[in-house]
Amino acid sequence: DKGDSGNIGELSSENFKVEVGGESVFVYQARVSKYPINQNWPGYQRPLEQTEIASFASFDYEAGKTVRITTEQKIESCDIRPKEFGIIPEVKGNTIEFVVTNPCQFVVEVNGHHKALHLFVNPKEQIQVDKEDSRIHYYGPGVHEAGVINVKSDETVYIDEGAIVYGVIRSENTSNIKVIGKGIL
């Protein structure tokens, strides 16, 4: 699988398989709210019965590459949101195909909005940072239990491709901070 370095310690989706240009892309599963309205209560976490498993994948944009999504379920409807992107899926059996024309983020809803697939199509870029710089909070490939990451003015959090960071970024009364990289927070 393309993206194997990013799946350390994470479960793959049971609902979707994704290929881009004929190459497999790792599809993660994540627990999300099953309700369209969320509450903004600091410290509040939904009870487990108010959540469901969604899927997501991330890959670099390459012009002209076909995205192929396969699911075990019979596809009765398929919507790609936001609709403004104009991505028109072609459905054949249990497979969905389309071409993405630029880097973007969107959701593929099969048979309704529950258990959706979130796709993150990244610009192809190489980020250069000095990992030894004291102003860089660097997280390399692998799983990191970071807890609270306190960021001061003029500092950068760099989450490298293949990194999975469990934590929260905290920054108060600061300026010129950046959170960059292709990893997962």
Language-model regions: role of each:
Residues K2-K131:
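Beta-strand-enriched, solvent-exposed domains that form extended recognition/catalytic surfaces
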Residues Y61, V100, K131, Y138-Y139, ...:
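Hydrophobic beta-strand core residues of beta-sandwich domains
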Residues K65-T66, R135-I136, E155-T156:
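Hydrophobic beta-strand segments of well-ordered beta-sheets in folded domains
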Residues F98-V100, H144-E155, I164-I180:
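Extracellular beta-strand-rich solenoid/capping regions of secreted or surface-exposed proteins
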Residues Q105, I136, N176:
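A residue-level signal for beta-strand positions that form part of recognition/binding surfaces
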Residues N111, R135, Y139-G142, I159-A163, ...:
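Extracellular beta-strand-rich, repetitive "passenger/adhesive" scaffolds
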